[in-house]
Design a protein with these regions (language model features):
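A generic structural signal for short
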Residues: 18-19, 106
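Short secondary-structure capping/junction motifs at helix and strand boundaries
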Residues: 2-4, 128-129
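A well-ordered secondary-structure block
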Residues: 75-160, 165-168
Length: 170
């Protein structure tokens, strides 16, 4: 009986957070960009991911808004809530919103979305400074997507809200 309870607890704990394929590709593309600048790669951080996921989900509630604020809380509050520690060092949060239409047959949608998000962040002076800061060692990215038909056969609209949280501490 103890073994069954442990297995159930382990499965629930392990599934409490889950990166999507797109989330992983975003981090991969961010590391490719950093590598092109001879910067160290970012290591995945569960705390950064959970903080990013919380903000991305919040952004999806109202597609007309894009903000770093979440009902009076900021990135530090979200990171502390996601982390096992109440202390953190240097934190950064980069956010993006975009909408794209893709053919239903397109097999590279996630790759294209991730590439577009990195380009958006590169073009923003402040977001690029966070993304390319040598102090940053850990990161987690979360992208949420609202999908809708656009009235043209074979095409779908993707409205994306993405957040990446970066930190110098795990």
């Amino acid at each position: 009986m103890k073994a069954i309870i442990y297995i159930a607890f382990f499965l629930i704990s392990a599934s409490a957070f889950a990166q999507t394929a797109l989330d992983s590709i975003i981090l991969k593309k961010a590391n490719e960009y950093r590598d092109s600048l001879c910067l160290p790669k970012l290591e995945f951080s569960k705390s950064c991911f959970v903080a990013a996921e919380s903000q991305a989900a919040f952004q999806m509630k109202d597609l007309s808004k894009i903000t770093h604020d979440q009902n009076g809380s900021d990135i530090g509050d979200r990171y502390k809530k996601a982390s096992s520690s109440s202390r953190f060092g240097y934190l950064g949060e980069i956010i993006a919103a975009c909408g794209k239409n893709f053919r239903d047959s397109d097999s590279l949608i996630n790759e294209k979305i991730a590439k577009d998000l990195i380009e958006i962040w590169k073009k923003s002076k402040d977001h690029n400074a966070i993304l390319t800061s040598p102090r940053m060692k850990y990161a987690g990215a979360s992208a949420m997507i609202a999908v809708s038909k656009i009235g043209i056969r074979g095409w779908t609209r993707y409205d994306i809200r993405a957040v990446m949280v970066l930190s110098d501490t795990k």
